[in-house]
Amino acid sequence: MNPAIDLNCDMGESYGAWRMGNDEAVLQFVTSANIACGFHGGDPSTMRQTVAAALAHGVALGAHPSLPDLAGFGRRAMQITPQEAYDLVVYQVGALAGVAASQGARLHHVKAHGALYNMAAKDAALARAICQAVRDVDSDLVLYGLAGSALIDAARAIGLRAAQEVFADRTYQADGQLTPRSQPDAMITDLDQAIAQVLGMVRDGSVRTPDGQTVALQADTLCIHGDQPDALVFARGIRLALERDGIAIQAA
C-alpha cells in the first residue's frame, strides 16, 4: 500500500489593511487549511473569506490559535499558565467554528501557531491544556502537532485523534525539534532540497539534520508555510513530486 500524506497550509493571516500570503492560489494544492483566529492575524472578515475559499476548493477547515501577539505575529514566546492556554484555545477555536457553522460547515482540525505550537511541543502541561481545550470544544477534531512531540502524546492520552506534522521548509535538530528561526540554517529555501526532505520523511519515516544525523519520525501531515516568498512554487512543486512518487494526498 502506497503511503498517504495531508498537505496543510497556514492561511487567513491577513489583518485589516495588512495583507499576508497568497491563500487563493495555494488552496488548489493543499488538502487542509489552518485558519488564523484573530490573535496573530485574521480579522473577522478575513476569517469568513478564508473559510469560504477553502470550502470552494474542498479543503478541510482547521483552526490556527495563537498567543495574543498581533505585533509579533504570534512568534514571540511568553509565559502563560496551562489554564490560560486552555482559555486561549477554546476562545479561538470556538470563534472559527462559529464562522464555519455560518457557512454550513464544521471544523476538521486544530493546529496551534508559532510560539504556542513550539512551547507546547516541549511542555507537557501546556500540551495537555491545548488538547483538553480541543476535545472540550469538539471531540471529533484532529489535533495537528509536531511529530513525536508532547502535543502528540497529550492528544493520545485523552483519546483525541492526532496527526503528526512534518515541515518542508524547516530543518530539524537531533531531538526532533525544529531548528529555531533565529538560527541561520533554520529555513530551507531551495525547492529541490525541500522535496528531497519531504520524500524522505513520507517514504522512509526519517529526516537528516544539518549536521548529518538521521532522526526517525512519522509523517501524517506536511506543512507548507503560506507566508514564505515562494509559497506557491513550493506548494506546486511538492505536490507534483509526491504525485509522481505515487503518494496519495488527502486530509489527515
UniProtKB/Swiss-Prot annotation:
Sorted alphabetically, the keyword list is: ATP-binding, Hydrolase, Nucleotide-binding
Q: Recall the GO molecular function terms of this protein's record.
A: 5-oxoprolinase (ATP-hydrolyzing) activity; ATP binding
Please report any disulfide bonds recorded for this protein chain, giving both cysteine positions.
none
- Catalytic activity, EC: 3.5.2.9
Matching entries from NCBIfam families are given as: PRK05406.1-3, PRK05406.1-5
Q: How does it assemble?
A: Forms a complex composed of PxpA, PxpB and PxpC.
Family to which this protein belongs: Belongs to the LamB/PxpA family.
Q: What does this protein do?
A: Catalyzes the cleavage of 5-oxoproline to form L-glutamate coupled to the hydrolysis of ATP to ADP and inorganic phosphate.
Protein name per the record: 5-oxoprolinase subunit A
The record lists the organism as Bordetella pertussis (strain Tohama I / ATCC BAA-589 / NCTC 13251)
